[in-house]
Amino acid sequence: MQAKKRYFILLSAGSCLALLFYFGGLQFRASRSHSRREEHSGRNGLHHPSPDHFWPRFPDALRPFVPWDQLENEDSSVHVSPRQKREANSSIYKGKKCRMESCFDFTLCKKNGFKVYVYPQQKGEKIAESYQNILAAIEGSRFYTSDPSQACLFVLSLDTLDRDQLSPQYVHNLRSKVQSLHLWNNGRNHLIFNLYSGTWPDYTEDVGFDIGQAMLAKASISTENFRPNFDVSIPLFSKDHPRTGGERGFLKFNTIPPLRKYMLVFKGKRYLTGIGSDTRNALYHVHNGEDVVLLTTCKHGKDWQKHKDSRCDRDNTEYEKYDYREMLHNATFCLVPRGRRLGSFRFLEALQAACVPVMLSNGWELPFSEVINWNQAAVIGDERLLLQIPSTIRSIHQDKILALRQQTQFLWEAYFSSVEKIVLTTLEIIQDRIFKHISRNSLIWNKHPGGLFVLPQYSSYLGDFPYYYANLGLKPPSKFTAVIHAVTPLVSQSQPVLKLLVAAAKSQYCAQIIVLWNCDKPLPAKHRWPATSVPVIVIEGESKVMSSRFLPYDNIITDAVLSLDEDTVLSTTEVDFAFTVWQSFPERIVGYPARSHFWDNSKERWGYTSKWTNDYSMVLTGAAIYHKYYHYLYTHYLPASLKNMVDQLANCEDILMNFLVSAVTKLPPIKVTQKKQYKETMMGQTSRASRWADPDHFAQRQSCMNTFASWFGYMPLIHSQMRLDPVLFKDQVSILRKKYRDIERL
């Protein structure tokens, strides 16, 4: 019985196998016959429809789905042959072995330093607004030169941002235009900016012309094509991204615990087919509609309904229920999946919103990855492990989440909030490669205030900057140099400048006194100056302009600078107290005369006031202490146009210094004690000091406020209501218990 069953099973299997071979052979022969008939009919101009029982040809069932700039547009006529792909790839990888050592001429940078030349714009050439902003940022920077013979780096005026052939911004015949440039030199020492490259269906990283030995500052660049220590990966930004300044991050205060309404969110397009569709098509597996809200829509492109699947209607309905901004500001983590290209606008949006980015874009070289440690600000995921993302982020400790969130705000404000910062960061990275002996280290790039405000030309030692004392375990300086700005001749021994000099010299923290003689009269004889226990150095300014008081003089031997106007009235006790306060806040301006700014709605401009109000945003440098690094930053970071304005008006230098320090620290200055007698309306009426009583003086300061705010691109000044007084100040206790007892008598 068992043998019969075995024979029956073998016979059935053999019959099935024979039938399979038979019908398969017929199908194969029919297919070959059909292809021959098609070939024959093609030659004779005839067409025969294929039988219904033929095997389906799946590529025909999936029609091309063509996006551009993340806005879907279908153009089924676009076809890329294998030969065209090979040509595109060859142009991409032709200079793949380029590095700074092999494709960059360092000798051009040795003579004049790091200078950048922008080619003159050619008549008739259209330039997109985004590229105009890039060129404007370069031309407004301290690196710019209009003389190509002084240049170390060259930037094209031809718009290379959008190299998608379907884009209306695409510049045709770029290859011949670039080759005709007499300074091109096969791209050597050239930098090319690019946001979009390639087109449907592959989105290769081909920019459409031979870049030769040029460097690429490129968005959505892959790790495979990225040339380390040569190219620069930049973020993908929209045409509405501000040119300068930009909005600050949305994190106004830290919440403990740092959890928001949603754990993980995303809202964006769902690509049904093609490159970039795999991850977005699978997001619904992770979406739970509660604390993980991942929304996609099929409604994009002209013919989206032709490609819709059974889930589209449900996804579209769910998509409309949520407001993207509300989700963004109430989420702990934001998913940043790849689009058609590796980069996404969601990346910068998440950074600004203090929503920790969860990256799902395998192979993307993250922006400025050469200097930024993204593990401190983002979660780097893997597209292949999508289903593990929720459990991964839930396992992150709250302390780590808070640190990640704070770092997103720092990176956004330091490097990404404007086109100017993106461009300057790119240039600073290249400069660090050229001058490696004074390049910034990882701590500078990843800690406040960031690489753009810490100039390595000042010093290669972090302890010489006021921002890293805690990181290095150092104590702030114990001595200061008093710099007195003198503009009136010395005619009497009772002049305020001499009393001020003696009071400063008596301070236990004073190392030396420098008198900056900006008076038109000759220097007084040495015996006219009072005898002091510390050295007194008199420097005669060559140009005798207002900005000269902030020059980085080699004579200043201490890190702390006590800046004084010649008619300031301060006692030794007040000097000592201000300096001890500054030692706790070495990165800020600490002093006595406070002023404030406000927005004038009627005039739609910024205003300046010296009224005694409950808050302030400036401490004038007529009686203030700050770090001497700000002298170097004032001289070498600020543009000549602002300093020339200050010198021509002989005014506003103190306002400009406050703008600079607040822009760097993102913090207000600190006022000490309630002293109010330092007022512009109470200054002397003689000689050059009469500028304080000049009716135009106050109007000039109003104008300066708006000019400075325009250059910075935003208002960096921050209001504060904090005033620091000595312990037991004005308390009803014995005067013997008070350290700075003389301050109460003033």
Curated annotation (Swiss-Prot):
The chain crosses the membrane at residues 8-28. Keywords: Disulfide bond, Endoplasmic reticulum, Glycoprotein, Glycosyltransferase, Golgi apparatus, Manganese, Membrane, Metal-binding, Signal-anchor, Transferase, Transmembrane, Transmembrane helix. Residues 29-746 are lumenal. InterPro entries: Exostosin, Exostosin_GT47, GT64_dom, Nucleotide-diphossugar_trans. Glycans are attached at residues 89, 330. GO terms for molecular function: acetylglucosaminyltransferase activity; glucuronosyl-N-acetylglucosaminyl-proteoglycan 4-alpha-N-acetylglucosaminyltransferase activity; glucuronosyltransferase activity; metal ion binding; N-acetylglucosaminyl-proteoglycan 4-beta-glucuronosyltransferase activity; protein heterodimerization activity; protein homodimerization activity. Disulfide bonds join 98-103, 109-152, 298-312, 334-355, 652-704. It is an enzyme of class 2 (transferase). GO terms for cellular component: catalytic complex; endoplasmic reticulum; endoplasmic reticulum membrane; Golgi apparatus; Golgi membrane; synapse. The keyword Glycosyltransferase applies. Pathway: Protein modification; protein glycosylation. It is found in: Golgi apparatus membrane; Golgi apparatus, cis-Golgi network membrane; Endoplasmic reticulum membrane. Belongs to the glycosyltransferase 47 family. Part of the heparan sulfate polymerase, a dimeric complex composed of EXT1 and EXT2. Could also form homooligomeric complexes. Interacts with NDST1. This is Exostosin-1. The gene is EXT1.
